[in-house]
Amino acid sequence: MKGNVSELLNATQQAPGGGEGGRPRPSWLASTLAFILIFTIVVDILGNLLVILSVYRNKKLRNSGNIFVVSLAVADLVVAVYPYPLVLTSILNNGWNLGYLHCQVSAFLMGLSVIGSIFNITGIAMNRYCYICHSLKYDKIYSNKNSLCYVFLIWMLTLIAIMPNLQTGTLQYDPRIYSCTFTQSVSSAYTIAVVVFHFIVPMIIVIFCYLRIWVLVLQVRRRVKPDNKPKLKPQDFRNFVTMFVVFVLFAICWAPLNLIGLIVASDPATMVPRIPEWLFVASYYLAYFNSCLNAIIYGLLNQNFRKEYKKIIVSLCTAKMFFVESSNEEADKIKCKPSPLIPNNNLIKVDSV
């Protein structure tokens, strides 16, 4: 531990930004990174709290499928309430001066958040796959009790996956990004294992689930003559697209950093100096930025969440109590009700292989 502490202290004493050889960085860079992080923190906290409150208040949104959505929101909140503010402090102070313990806890929680996010996104994809492609079995497999057990399992697997970081010495301060984080160059084998099991394997599972769903969607839409086979409702398709967009954005935001990890792990001594610092920093802050996007996507693409967001904001602005269930009287007057993000009742009764 003493060695790690001395490394941390040495890192904070490097030239601004900690670039190789003490190269100075553009004066605008710290301000830009601080702005990105402040925006991410504010939108992350407000947006994901809106998601959680929306599910809590609205009975239509309070169902077994949305348990995974709430769990994903919690994973995104973790980084906004502790690690990101510490990174922001590091940017403003041009170095880490918060000590070894805060560095380790911050890096641990960052890892917990990202692994929890990808595991929850995988759980959502499996939920959507079962709902659309095996809907006859959906109610039995995804009862409220079972869904809570699945979410508990997701977080247990997340803890198991992140614990080795505490023993491998990979959680260190990186002055290039002003963050205590997973250091890719410490162990090539471990870095490759992390990328494969924490990113590539979950991505393969998610891609498989969504490809099967797209195949079914195309099959349903190509039917010309009416038949007795059930049709895919527009609400189901919109709900599926919402979660598909969440997955695509996560993959886009995190793929560059994981690709860099594989490149670095191939030969740390040779590849680390070859990775442009701007690319490394951009890949990290793109990944950081992802934590604030999901709540925005729900609001843009899902009418039920959007309406509940508005109700909560209006309640706050008018000083009304918002920890109460939303009234369904107004909704009952509407003939065409939009389905929630992940509805309770199956609209498709198809059991495809």
Curated annotation (Swiss-Prot):
Classification via SUPFAM superfamilies: Family A G protein-coupled receptor-like
Cytoplasmic side of membrane: 54-66, 127-145, 212-243, 299-353
Gene Ontology terms describing biological process: adenylate cyclase-inhibiting G protein-coupled receptor signaling pathway; circadian rhythm
Membrane topology of the entry: Multi-pass membrane protein
Keyword field contains Membrane: yes
Keyword annotations: Cell membrane, Disulfide bond, G-protein coupled receptor, Glycoprotein, Membrane, Receptor, Transducer, Transmembrane, Transmembrane helix
Summary of the function given for this chain in its UniProt record: High affinity receptor for melatonin. Likely to mediate the reproductive and circadian actions of melatonin. The activity of this receptor is mediated by pertussis toxin sensitive G proteins that inhibit adenylate cyclase activity. Possibly involved in sleep induction, by melatonin activation of the potassium channel KCNMA1/BK and the dissociation of G-beta and G-gamma subunits, thereby decreasing synaptic transmission.
Protein name per the record: Melatonin receptor type 1A
Organism: Mus musculus
